[in-house]
């Protein structure tokens, strides 16, 4: 499974748990943004519709795996400053050959790529890094959230480590795209406790 849903037995129940934890008894758009990304429209009782996340190769915009993939692509194609490239390779003790091996020949490349994304959080002050994260979040909003009917009148809530640790950039992306940002929480338990009380 390519999503950050270790606390959940199945995708369907995890989406419902996330929606309930985020929206409570109100309608809204619930988004999961961790190793993978996902979203659904929730009517206050159940999930009405879901835009397929498509996994980290074709979709999963804004996820840790997608951010890691974009980061590695920019590092290997010299789109980051030489200083950032050197800092990245040194911090993770990697060579370009190691990266290719981990992505194309080893199992779970999505997890490997997601494990690199904290480098972006540590270097958000760099304009090229901030732009990479911002553009990935805007792509998530455009390709997922904006597909839901009446999205302009719904609060859009987020759960997951990526949404939580990059909440400032996520808020900037939402503002630029004209999206009403709701709650941003790290773990589903916070919201579920509130939902069931």
Name the predicted role of every residue range.
Residues 1, 63, 128-132:
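Conserved acidic
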Residues 1-2, 6-13:
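Short, small-residue-biased leader/transition segments that mark boundaries at the very start
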Residues 11-83:
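Phosphate-binding/catalytic loop of phosphoryl-transfer enzymes
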Residues 21-29, 70-197:
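ATP-binding/phosphotransfer module of carbohydrate and carboxylate kinases, centering on a glycine-rich
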């Amino acid at each position: 499974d390519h999503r950050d849903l270790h606390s959940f037995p199945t995708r369907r129940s995890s989406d419902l748990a996330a929606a309930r934890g985020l929206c409570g008894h109100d309608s809204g758009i619930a988004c999961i943004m961790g190793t993978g990304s996902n979203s659904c429209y929730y009517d206050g009782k159940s999930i009405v519709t879901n835009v397929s996340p498509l996994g980290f190769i074709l979709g999963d915009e804004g996820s840790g795996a997608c951010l890691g993939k974009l980061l590695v692509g920019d590092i290997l194609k010299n789109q980051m400053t030489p200083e950032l490239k050197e800092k990245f390779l040194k911090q993770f003790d990697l060579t370009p050959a190691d990266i290719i091996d981990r992505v194309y020949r080893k199992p779970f490349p999505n997890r490997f790529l997601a494990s690199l994304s904290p480098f972006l959080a540590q270097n958000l002050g760099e304009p090229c890094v901030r732009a990479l994260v911002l553009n990935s979040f805007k792509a998530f909003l455009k390709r997922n959230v904006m597909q839901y009917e009446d999205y302009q009148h719904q609060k859009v809530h987020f759960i997951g480590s990526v949404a939580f640790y990059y909440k400032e950039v996520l808020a900037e992306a939402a503002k630029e795209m004209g999206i009403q940002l709701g709650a941003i929480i790290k773990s589903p338990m916070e919201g579920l406790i509130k939902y069931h009380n």
